[in-house]
Every structure is written in C-alpha cells, then in structure tokens.
C-alpha cells in the first residue's frame, strides 16, 4: 500500500497473507534468520494473550529502540493486525485519552482458514491471483499496492 495502511477484503486475505509472508509462518521465518529478535519478542507476547494494546506491547517486550518499526514490519507482513481499540484507564478505572490500537495475530481475528488458506500455493501464484482480481482497477495503479 505504498507504506500506508490499507484494507484487504476477506476473500483476498489468504493470498495477500501468503504473498506478504512469502510462504512462511512466523516461527519458520524466525528460524531461517529472516526476522529480527525484536519481532520474536513481540510475537511471543501473543502466546498467552489474544489481543494487546500497543502501549502494553512496548512495555512488555522491553524493546526500546526500533519498536514502532518492528510493529510496522509485523503488520506489513500480516503477522499482526489491528483488532480493536481501547483507552487507558486511571486509578478509578475511568477511561481517558485517545483510543489506542489493540493488536492481534490475524489468525485469531479472522480464523486460520482465512489467513492460511493459500499456504498451499506459492507466493508467486498468490500474486497472480491478486493481480487478476485487481485487473479491473488497473487504471488506478492497484497492482502496485501489492508490494510492501
């Protein structure tokens, strides 16, 4: 999406995730040395929790430098997605401040069948399927939206 946020319909999400993940689930990506340790620190937080507000992820992960870019990279690769919004609470449990994004692995938001449905295809095949789907919108430069 040219470095910007975007929306992907659920009927395209399997191929989109397969393309952006280059055919890897996160553990395999990390084991092959293609994901930094900061990404692993963040993803490990979701082993026991379904969604976590972004400010808590920063505190729990212990990542000081490069936190925002680590989260952005995980979102671009479709390993994390915004699952909702929450607000901080004061000592009296009253909400205050701006809404804050809660992040989750998309498998927990949309279901594993939707997210991993194209894992049997190569990333190149997923790209071809997405380009075919976007072809009617080609005048808008739509296929350029597929590259990270």
Language-model regions, residue ranges each:
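Long, low-complexity intrinsically disordered regions
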Residues: 1-148
């Amino acid at each position: 999406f040219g470095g910007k946020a975007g929306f992907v319909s659920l009927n395209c999400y399997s191929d989109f995730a397969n393309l952006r993940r280059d055919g890897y689930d996160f553990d395999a990506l990390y084991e092959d040395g293609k994901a930094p340790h900061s990404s692993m620190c963040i993803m490990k937080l979701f082993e026991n929790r379904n969604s976590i507000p972004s400010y808590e992820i920063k505190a729990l992960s212990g990542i000081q430098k490069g936190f925002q870019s680590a989260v952005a990279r995980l979102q671009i690769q479709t390993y994390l997605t915004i699952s909702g919004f929450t607000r901080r609470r004061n000592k009296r449990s009253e909400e205050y401040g701006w809404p804050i994004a809660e992040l989750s692995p998309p498998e927990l938001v949309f279901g594993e069948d939707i997210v991993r449905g194209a894992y049997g295809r190569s990333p190149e095949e997923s790209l071809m399927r997405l380009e075919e789907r976007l072809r009617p919108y080609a005048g808008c430069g739509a296929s350029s939206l597929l590259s990270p």
